[in-house]
Curated annotation (Swiss-Prot):
Keywords: Chromosome, Coiled coil, Isopeptide bond, Nucleus, Phosphoprotein, Repressor, Transcription, Transcription regulation, Ubl conjugation
Ranges annotated as biased composition (Polar residues): 378-387
Record remark: domains: The Pro-Xaa-Val-Xaa-Leu (PxVxL) motif mediates interaction with HP1 (CBX1/HP1-beta, CBX3/HP1-gamma and CBX5/HP1-alpha).
Compartments in which it is found: Chromosome; Nucleus matrix
Organism: Homo sapiens (Human)
Protein function: Together with SMCHD1, involved in chromosome X inactivation in females by promoting the compaction of heterochromatin. Also able to repress the ligand-induced transcriptional activity of retinoic acid receptor alpha (RARA), possibly through direct recruitment of histone deacetylases. Also required for silencing of the DUX4 locus in somatic cells.
Assembly with partners or alone: Interacts with RARA. Interacts with SMCHD1; leading to recruitment to inactivated chromosome X in females. Interacts (via PxVxL motif) with HP1 (CBX1/HP1-beta, CBX3/HP1-gamma and CBX5/HP1-alpha).
Crosslink feature (Glycyl lysine isopeptide (Lys-Gly) (interchain with G-Cter in SUMO2)) location: 259, 279, 446, 605, 702
One GO term (biological process): regulation of DNA-templated transcription
Name this protein carries in UniProt: Ligand-dependent nuclear receptor-interacting factor 1
GO cellular component: Barr body; centriolar satellite; nuclear matrix; nucleoplasm
Length: 769
């Protein structure tokens, strides 16, 4: 053993202050095998500074002989992230590293003092498939000190192993028979938390739960009184997310290092595993909320599964279980949950569709679906987080009669760190949840609103069953972000941290003094008054577009009803008793000159008359400009079409024209000449000088449209007629409006055909040139 023991040279990184305590924090050390002057093998730790994410060794490794290269292991990088509270703390860190002859593993032993009992050390490697099953770890308590020893095999691939020693309580994920490696359970924010009788569960689950309940000393289960259990569904299976510490050390893709190391816990003493002490309040902001489960050695021993919790009610219940187990108290102060009548018809059989957690008697059971294989669709669904999707508050899972396979394991050790961030709050919703929400909305209309005095839990069972999904996300009674406290550290089995700034709490803030039934009635009224919010929550992009179309249709119907009402008032004023239908005749093209406009403008008000006269003069000036300037390039045409259409739509929206449909149809069908004139006609808010400038701008842009001179006067006539009818009839009768729309469509089609023919002639001329 003495021959194999190797000395370690710990060279601190050179820093400006010269303080040795700073080199321990945030430095990288590379283990290099060298040969000493006496011929013995040495392990030398070389400091590696971090510059812009790249690892650069300060000291080059010495050259080894070819005879020793065969037994050389891969380099191991040791990272220390130590938070030194005071300057009096010893800066020296002893890392005795030795290698026995029968093994190629490096054993790193470190002494942890009493002030760092909350330290959790995680061991990671770049290649999990080759060396992960060989990693071994055990801890021994000696007089308040904890000795942590790791056996890290060198990686068989080119990537190097690394060890992360972190003071911020990174959880160590232990292998579980229920879930494969690198996965944990996720309780989503929209999970359903309810209290159901044990008789509603499948028979196999009842046998397991009742068997543990009768053997426990907390209370005997009588035959006449069926106990109630807490049912949490759905529970998803997701992959572990890499923490920020790993990202800082290795700037690799997340997929390469996202899985935690699986530790073989057969050598861990039971008292050490079950009594992990956490320093209160010092939890990493980046560490996920996980349940750490111990590996089961026998078929009926409890197993440990990592779990994330995003549900406030579930966190409250788990915290209550932990407090009861720590204090030795059998009473549980449960949050207000709606219960199901044990004598109800629905409670006889409650088939389970999704994975669920059942909490009873201080123990947590996992109910898995039959034939679930890590559920890859759920994993992809959890990874595709859409921040724009709001969290739905009233998910009622539609249950079916699919058989379930009961996998129940007792929880032995739960260590929870603080939640990572609120990015896991918003989850993409599955199709079954969308359908179930529609069913809930349909059934909710049938439920009578309960009176505030009705507080009997044994009331109508069907209404209670509907209401239980609405009391899921009430504001919890306990303060947000509670911790165990710095001054009074104690042995805890689990600590739950509620999310700060949760979206759920900002939407529903209900006093804790209100009982469950009153809360349910309030929430029922609140949700019935906001169907639009549910529509936006449950709809996809297609449904959103359909909702906008429905909104436009409803606005159109309301406008039409308003027109009918005002039409009836006009008929009363003028003494009309019959419906009149106005027939419009088309004005010939040769009459649509400037003089023809003056005869029509005499009927218009003074403001409109000035505007019309100005438009006529500008139209004549435009014709002259067309005659003078015909030889512009035609490739400018496509560059400005989109810009003009956008300006046209914007002007129509700003000015609030009565005939929005006509202007939109115009901007989509007419070429640029009509669009520019329509812009000038509809911009009533602009001054005369601005209109003149805009007219000249469009005139210079469309010099290539000289062949359309014959249509210019006709188009001005068309637009004048439109403006004329809008000014004289502010509220157009429905029949007249339909006639005008049909006439406009016919004219637009004709203009389109004429201009297409003109463009074709221009193309032929250019081709001939």
């Amino acid at each position: 053993m003495s021959n194999n023991l190797r000395r370690v040279f710990l060279k601190p990184a050179e820093e400006n202050s010269g303080n040795a305590s700073r080199c321990v924090s945030g430095c990288m050390y590379q283990v290099v095998q060298t040969i000493g002057s006496d011929g013995k093998n040495l392990l030398q730790l070389l400091p590696i500074p971090k510059s812009s994410g790249n690892l650069i060794p300060l000291v080059q490794s010495s050259v080894m002989s070819d005879a020793l290269k065969g037994n050389t292991g891969k380099p191991v990088q040791v990272t220390f992230q130590t938070q030194i509270s005071s300057s009096s703390t010893s800066a020296s860190v002893q890392l005795p590293i030795f290698q026995p002859a029968s093994s190629s593993n490096y054993f790193l032993t470190r002494t942890v003092d009493t002030s760092e009992k909350g330290r959790v050390t995680s061991v990671g490697t770049g290649n999990f498939s080759s060396s992960v099953s060989k990693v071994q770890s055990h801890g021994v308590k000696i007089d308040g000190l904890t000795m942590q020893t790791f056996a890290v095999p060198p990686s068989t691939q080119k990537d190097s192993s690394f060890i992360v020693v972190n003071t911020q309580s990174l959880p160590v994920t232990v292998k579980s028979p229920v879930l494969p490696s690198g996965h944990h359970l996720q309780i989503p924010a929209h999970a359903e938390v309810k209290s159901v009788p044990a008789s509603s569960l499948p028979p196999s689950v009842q046998q397991k739960i009742l068997a543990t309940a009768t053997t426990s000393t907390s209370g005997m289960v009588e035959a006449s009184q069926m106990p109630t259990v807490i049912y949490v569904s759905p529970v998803n299976t997701v992959k572990n997310v890499v923490t920020k510490n790993f990202q800082n050390i290795y700037p690799k893709p997340v997929t390469e290092i996202a899985k935690p190391v699986i530790l073989n816990t057969t050598q861990i003493p039971k008292n050490v595993a079950t009594e992990t002490q956490l320093k209160g309040g010092q939890h990493s902001q980046a560490a996920p909320v996980k349940w750490i489960f111990q590996d089961n050695l026998q078929p009926f021993t409890p197993s440990l599964v990592p779990v994330k919790s995003s549900n406030n009610v579930a966190s409250k219940i788990l915290k209550t279980f932990v407090d009861r187990k720590n204090l030795g108290d059998n009473t549980i102060n449960m949050p207000p949950l709606s219960t199901i009548d044990p004598s109800g018809t629905r409670s006889k059989n409650m088939p389970i569709k999704d994975n669920a957690l059942v909490m009873f008697n201080g123990k947590v059971y996992l109910l898995a679906k039959k034939g679930t294989d890590v559920l890859p669709s759920q994993i992809d669904q959890q990874n595709s987080v859409s921040p724009d999707t709001p969290v739905r508050k009233d998910t009622l899972q539609t249950v079916s009669s699919s058989p379930v396979t009961e996998i129940s394991r007792e929880v032995v050790n739960i260590v929870l760190a603080k939640s990572k961030s609120s990015q896991m709050e918003t989850k993409s919703l599955s199709n079954t949840q969308l359908a179930s929400m529609a069913n809930l909305r349909a059934e909710k209309n049938k439920v009578e609103k309960p009176s505030p005095s009705t507080t009997n839990p044994h009331m109508n069972q069907s209404s209670n069953y509907l209401k239980q999904s609405k009391t899921l996300f009430t504001n919890p009674i306990f303060p947000v972000g509670f911790s165990t406290g710095h001054n009074a550290p104690r042995k805890v089995t689990a600590v739950i941290y509620a999310r700060k700034g949760s979206v759920l709490q900002s939407i529903e803030k209900i006093s804790s003094s209100v009982d469950a039934t009153t809360v349910t009635s309030q929430q029922c009224v609140f949700r019935d008054q906001e169907p639009k919010i549910h529509n936006e929550m449950a709809s996809t992009s297609d449904k959103g577009a359909q909702g906008r179309n429905d909104k436009k249709d409803s606005q159109g119907r309301s406008n039409k009803a308003l027109h009918l009402k005002s039409d009836a008032e006009f008929k009363k004023i003028f003494g009309l008793t019959k419906d009149l239908r106005v027939c419009l005749t088309r004005i010939p093209d040769h009459l649509t000159s400037g003089e023809g406009f003056d005869s029509f403008s005499s009927l218009v008000k003074s403001g409109t008359y000035k505007e019309t006269e100005f438009m006529v003069k500008e139209g004549e000036r435009k014709q002259q400009n067309f005659d003078k300037k015909r030889k512009a390039k035609t490739n400018k045409k496509m560059d400005h079409i989109k810009k003009r259409k956008t300006e046209n739509a914007y002007n129509a929206i700003i000015n609030g024209e009565a005939n929005v449909t006509g202007s939109q149809l115009l901007s989509s069908i007419l070429p640029t000449s009509d669009v520019s004139q329509h812009n000038i006609l509809t911009s009533h808010s602009k001054t005369r000088q601005e209109k003149r400038t805009e007219m000249e701008y469009y005139t210079h842009e469309k010099q290539e449209k000289g062949t359309l001179n014959s249509n210019a006067a006709y188009e001005q006539s068309h637009f004048f007629n439109k403006n004329y009818t809008e000014d004289i009839f502010p509220v157009t009768p429905p029949e007249l409006e339909e006639t005008i729309r049909d006439e406009k469509i016919r004219r637009l089609k004709q203009v389109l055909r004429e201009k297409e023919a003109a463009l074709e002639e221009m193309r032929k001329k250019m081709h001939q040139k």
